[in-house]
Amino acid sequence: MKRISLILLLFSCNFLVSQRIALVGGTLIDGYGNAPIYDSVILINDETIIDIGTVGNIVVPEEYEVVSTEGMSVMPGLWDMHVHLMINGHSDYAYWDKTYPKLFKDVIMPSSAHQLLMAGVTSARDLGGPLEESLEVRDMINSGKIPGPTMYMSGPFVQKKPYPGTELFRWGVNGEKDARNKIRILAKAGVDLIKLIDQDQMTFEELSAIVDEAHKHNLKVVAHAHRPCLLYTSPSPRDPHLS
């Protein structure tokens, strides 16, 4: 049996509040390359898939709420490994960064999370955003207060120097001691991983301290290697993202 990870494309997941659900009539794509199952039936009990078949071979128990998926595709929820909930439909970073931070937590980040869910994404990594807002939005999703995928949040970018006006979501490091302290703060706050950017501007000692301190707190480190010079040899083989 599997924990439920299905999402109906173009269909709200709000119906899953019921304990016993039967999804009936859709085309099931299992994500493993097998042939689609037409006229599928999926029985869900307390968020656990207990049976999968077709209209012809599964009888839906009377106590199940039937949700028609006829004409729809049903598939496993998707993962998006690199998102920024604070960025939504814009191209002018300078304008965005000074205009909209006050709307991040209550408007923009929840809206971005909802859009991901409606696109079929049920889990995502947010790799750079304001610390408090990121964790609050993650926790609101987890508690069912707002719709969205399961979010894994890095909080602020960690870099040598934040760009002017971006200090809310970009944290600079100045020396090995400061690098370790920044990671301790993030770990204590409850981030799920650490995000590096512009690490070619750091000393190797600063970079090594970040990775080492992150590992002490069982946090993975993801590096944004968008320039050839950023393809460092990792200070630790545990983070292939830095290779």
Give the predicted meaning of each segment:
Residues M1-Q19:
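Bacterial Sec-dependent N-terminal signal peptides
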Residues G26, I42, E47, G71, ...:
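Divalent metal-coordination and catalytic microenvironments
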Residues L28, Y32-M75:
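Histidine-rich, glycine-flanked metal-binding segment
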Residues S73-M140, P164, E205, H226, ...:
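Metal-associated gating/positioning segment near the N- to mid-region
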Residues M109-E132, P149-P156, K188-Q199, K220, ...:
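Divalent metal-dependent hydrolysis catalytic cores, especially in the metallo-beta-lactamase
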Residues P147-P149, L207-A223:
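Alpha-helix-loop-beta-strand connector modules within alpha/beta enzyme cores
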Residues P162-D212:
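Active-site gating/metal-coordination segments in enzymes
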Residues Y232-S243:
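Single conserved hydrophobic/aromatic residue that forms the stacking wall/gate
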